Every structure is written in structure tokens, then in C-alpha cells.
Amino acid sequence: MALDRTTKGVLLGFASFAVFSFSDACVKLIKGQLPPYESAFFGAVFGLSILPFLLRKGDHWIDILSTTNLPLWLVRFLAYPMGVIGSVTAFTHLSMAEAFVLIFLQPAYITVMSVFFLKERVGFRRWSAVAIGFLGVLIVLRPGFRPLSIGHLGALFAGLGGAVSVVAFRAARGKEKNVSLFGAGILGGVIVCGLLTFPSFTPPSGDQWAKLAGYGLLAAVANVLTMWAARQAPAAYIGPTQYSQMVWAILLGYVLFGDGADLPMVAGIVLIVASGLLTLIRENVRGTPLPPSVAGERHVAAALVPNPA
């Protein structure tokens, strides 16, 4: 029986976020043997393979550097490396489930930033979703009851970097070409992380090269799958599929790294996922463009935020 377009889109969405999860597992398998900015650099280099898929008829490679708003372009250029270095740090030092659940607070950051930078009006329900999300984080972190690490700080920067990118996407929506919107971030990853890498460059081993390639190329494949998904189904159906990453995080964490999840962790996961879903539902009702995948600062907004430019 032939599947309708919406069903195909949703299935592609689930597939894309499964691939994203395997990408993050690849960088975690490096186990911190390379600096996070070096892993981020090579991930961005391999991620350049997505750029041809962003080119539309009439686009040119030079359009990556073209912009009608240089400050916003620079924000995207800097936000991506901040987010991806943070996510690599988080996945290196935390369990996959804990890293994901903290990065998944990104929709709450977006709500708060949208008030100040986009002058959006936020009602009681969206503020309630923010409060639920922060409560979930407190339950996961349990400050004062367990030590916090650089991995938790990395997850914070990953979420903030992704949120800054999404707010910049929304501010530039309809005014920039997709290849400029997302090329700025990928270039930022290559250049900024490259500048941090080369003064103390550690040559990867053969095994590490394979993991770095898996990290960057799988993320690129996942981005392409998400774009295909968004061509089949509305963003309102694709957006929630990103939360399937929590299932993959728990499964991969257990199988590959022997991670477990205690009761407070599960409770925090439920609250943070509920917070994100509430935000997605409210933004769909309001007609606000939905954010991209929140884990690992992924540039899939090309699919979830259609751009006529």
C-alpha cells in the first residue's frame, strides 16, 4: 500500500533524527582523546558536503558569503561553533541521555530570546512550558546533591548556540538565501574551530578518522533526510519527531557506553520533552516557524523554516 506524503515525511523525520543520534554517538566514541574544537572542526569539514543540497536554481557558491544583514550573518557564523563545541564537550563528559536532555532545553531559550530580540508576545502557556523545562533541568542536575562538570557547561552552550542560531534564522527569514543562512554557520565551524585547532593540532589516528567521518557525514545525511521530510509533510508534523532522539540516546548509551538512567533523570526527561512539545504546539498554533533539531546544534532549519529566497 502506497504511503501518503505526510506519512512519508514523518517516517523520514524519524529516520533523520535516528541518524543524528548515531552521529553524536560517533563523536562520543572518541572519548575526549581529541580536543572538542578539533572534533568540531573535522565535523564541520565533513559537514560541508551538505552545501550542494542547499543550492537552488540561480544560486551560486559565492552566495554563502552574500548577505543583506552582516551583523546577523556574523551571529550565525559565531553561534554554530559555540553550539557544536558545546555539544561535543557535553557528549564527551556526560551520558548520551543527560547530554540530550540538557540540550533539549533549547526551545525554552528560544522563547526567552524571542521576547527580547524579536519582540514576540509570549503568553501564559509558552511561559509555563519554559518553567516546566527549567524544572526538568533542576531535577536532572540536582545542584547541591551531585557534582557538576564541564560537560554540563558544554550542554548549556550547545543549547544557547542553537537558540541564538534559530532566533537569527527567524530575524532573517525571507530576506536571505538558504545557502547563506546555513553556509554561514558551517563556515563558522570550519574557520573558528580551525583557528582553535591548528596551534595545538593533534593528528587523529586511523580509528579516530573513521569516527570523525561518521560524526560529520552522518550529520550531513541526517540533514538531507530532514529536508526531504519537510518536502513531504508540514513542519508541524516533522518537528516533534526530533524527540525520538531521547529513545536513541538511552538505547545507544546503554548498548555502547553502559549508561543507565535513574528515576530523577527519567522524570527530568519527561518534563523537558513535555516542555519542548508544548512550545512546538503553541508555535504551530501561532504560525511561528518551528525550530530545527535541538541536539548538537544541527542546521536543519532549511527544511523546517521554508525560505522563499
How should these model regions be labeled?
Residues T89, P107-S128, V247-V266:
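C-terminal transmembrane-helix exit sites in multi-pass transporters
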Residues R125-L141, G162, P264-E283:
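Hydrophobic transmembrane alpha-helices of multi-pass small-molecule transport proteins
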Residues V247-A309:
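C-terminal-most transmembrane helix of multi-pass membrane proteins
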Residues F100-L105, A172-L187, N223-Y254:
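Helix-helix packing/entry segments at the starts of transmembrane helices
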Residues A18-F22, C26, L74-T89, F157-A168, ...:
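Hydrophobic alpha-helical transmembrane segments of multi-pass membrane transport proteins
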